[in-house]
C-alpha cells in the first residue's frame, strides 16, 4: 500500500519497519548529492567527497542505469511492484534496497517497498570466477546475483564454489553495529553465502567464534563458505594496521615515560649534590 505525504510521512513509514537492516534509494531528488536520506536511513545514495572508488564505479556502470530503469518501470506500473520485472535492477536488489522513495506533485513523496530485494545475505548456486576487476564488474550485466556470485580468481581460495546448495537454507541478521555484524545461518548442505555489505580490508570473519576466510564477490560485496548445520557468522572490523599503530603508540609512550623518569632522577640527584 502507498502512503503519500510529506518527507516526514515517508520517514515515519520506513522507520516503522523493524527489519534489522536494509537500504533506501531516494529517487525524489539528487540521489548522490543529498544527505537527508543518509541521516535517517542506510542509503544507496548520499554525498561523500571520498566515496569508495569501487562503489563509485558501480554507480557509473550499474546503479545509475538501474535507477533510471526503476523510475520508468515503477511509474508506468502506477507503483504496483508486482507489474515490475525484478530483472531490470539486479544490482539494486543485491544491495538490499528495500524502499524506493518516489516524487509526487506538490513536493510530496511516496515510499514504495521493493519485494525483490535479496536481503542481508543469501546462498548462491554457483560461483563464476573471472580474471580481473574489469571482467568482474562487466559480468554483473549478465548474471542473476540471487543465483550466481562473480568472484575475481585471486579470491578463489577464500570463496570456493559449493558442490551443492540448500535452497531452503536460511540466513538471518541477528545483530548490527557499525563494526560488528552477526548472522544466524542454518542449512542442510552449507554453501557459498554472499553478504550485502561492502568488502573492505580490516574486516575479519568468524564462524562460531573461529576466524574464517572471506573474500570479495560481485565487485563490492563479501562472500564466504559456510558449512552445513546451524552456525553464527560474525564480521568484526579489526584492522591489523590499527593494532600496529597502537603498539607503536604504546612503545613511544613507554620511551617517553622512561626519558621523563630519567630526567627527574638526574634533576633530583643534581639538587642533592648542591645541598651537600
Question: What is each residue range found by the language model?
Answer:
Residues 1, 26, 30, 112-114:
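Transmembrane alpha-helical segments
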Residues 2-5, 9-10:
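Short, small-residue-biased leader/transition segments that mark boundaries at the very start
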Residues 10-13, 263:
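Short, low-complexity export/processing leader segments characterized by acidic and small residues
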Residues 16-31:
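Gly/Pro-rich turn-and-neighbor structural signature
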Residues 32, 37-131, 161-168:
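A cross-kingdom signal targeting lumenal/periplasmic-facing segments of multi-pass membrane
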Residues 98, 107, 141-276:
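Active-site-proximal, structured, solvent-exposed surfaces of multi-pass membrane proteins
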Residues 126-146:
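Short, cationic low-complexity segments
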